[in-house]
């Protein structure tokens, strides 16, 4: 490919809405362009990198016996209603109606569609296990699309589904896929960690995430340096000791707290510490309102709450919904005297005394409220977001924290979907049973962004060789110099015959602009054909190095050096 023919519009400045480096650099380097919030076009450079990521994923999936298919993006509501997820999935599901007023969704995931496809075809245990996958677009109506490709409304994903006749068979495929994902991540060139994860709206009883390290990641990682335990803050259980107040219970009082709503404001106004305040958070689910109580200095884990009340549709109530239902603004809601609401409290609440809670009246809070006397939760469970310095749930050592980007997740689904959809087979004893299933996702477009978050410098992107849009670029310093043009073309043809993915920058622009574009786009290797050609030399420079080396302008010598440089190239190391 010649740069003069390549559609790669580079920019000096990032778009104003670029909050993270991957968004800024992919936009500036001519990989993506925004169509609407969370919706992007992939330009030729992006397509080349995405295709290479897909090829790595496809190869490893095929090697463990998975078979590729292509499923429809548009899915009828009936399938999702069968499993209950039409309502449970939440507002992130993109729903639409056809001209006949029939409900459909643009698939955020494909459990129902895959199960529906095989349910009438797989009849016997002899046809199991079966592992199918696809690579294609997914859709989620993010409430606030941001961070470029990291939280988009449309994204590219590999999703796979396996069908089994035993837990042992599922476990074997699950481990095979986990190992394949390790190989994929290493071939792509990311530094990563595997952690225990929550199953969320997908369901199942076991899940793991592959998370690439990045300071802007939305995944909060927790790790124990002593025993090796790792998880994210959605999944990690709290195993610390709860503080037990030994105070004498005081009389409860309703105090005027004008326009004081947040925990911080309440603590300052009443001159109390945050751990003497109980936050009351209202959620709406299938069965109405749920109130969650958590200590004021801790964050609530909504995933734990969803599991406890068995309702994945649970969402935080809007201010107008709270006001309409209780005639009380958010910020003054509390558990004292509230009716027809299921109240779930964090386990630590039962040991607190003389706490501050919302007064169920605008501009009022209760002080000295006590569990059992003034309010009684319907149930207790662990609702805390586990934080760095909390004890490890395995060995008790303090946990350390870091940030990361989830690039893949695998699930043991069990029989959740097969039971709901009556997807049955006959086992070796003649008994009819539901399939045991697994699910295996990989974010293709998200991976491209994760690479940039991890591998960049002040000049641009540093692509790993395996996924770079081109492995190297030949830069012709002067397009007007016939000798440079002829030699560069000769070198270009030679590299093409060696099956090197090469781009020839033949544009008639300044050398400085060419060098800046090469660094911005992030080609692993640059060969400069310039003035030194008159001395019989060309210059080779790795993207991760500040130094270039001169090599004799003989094709055999150039090939020998560049192959060695490409083999040794490691974008994680600066040399």
Curated annotation (Swiss-Prot):
Enzymatic reactions: tRNA(Pro) + L-proline + ATP = L-prolyl-tRNA(Pro) + AMP + diphosphate
Entry EC no(s): 6.1.1.15
Molecular functions per Gene Ontology: aminoacyl-tRNA deacylase activity; ATP binding; proline-tRNA ligase activity
Alphabetized UniProt keyword annotations: Aminoacyl-tRNA synthetase, ATP-binding, Cytoplasm, Ligase, Nucleotide-binding, Protein biosynthesis
One Pfam short name: HGTP_anticodon
Subcellular localization: Cytoplasm
SUPFAM superfamilies associated with the record: Class II aaRS ABD-related (SSF52954), Class II aaRS and biotin synthetases (SSF55681), YbaK/ProRS associated domain (SSF55826)
Enzyme class: ligase
Disulfide bonds: none
Subunit description: Homodimer.
Family in the record: Belongs to the class-II aminoacyl-tRNA synthetase family. ProS type 1 subfamily.
Domain topic, free-text comment: Consists of three domains: the N-terminal catalytic domain, the editing domain and the C-terminal anticodon-binding domain.
Free-text function comment from the UniProt entry: Catalyzes the attachment of proline to tRNA(Pro) in a two-step reaction: proline is first activated by ATP to form Pro-AMP and then transferred to the acceptor end of tRNA(Pro). As ProRS can inadvertently accommodate and process non-cognate amino acids such as alanine and cysteine, to avoid such errors it has two additional distinct editing activities against alanine. One activity is designated as 'pretransfer' editing and involves the tRNA(Pro)-independent hydrolysis of activated Ala-AMP.
Name this protein carries in UniProt: Proline--tRNA ligase
Source species taxonomy: Bacteria, Thermotogati, Thermotogota, Thermotogae, Thermotogales
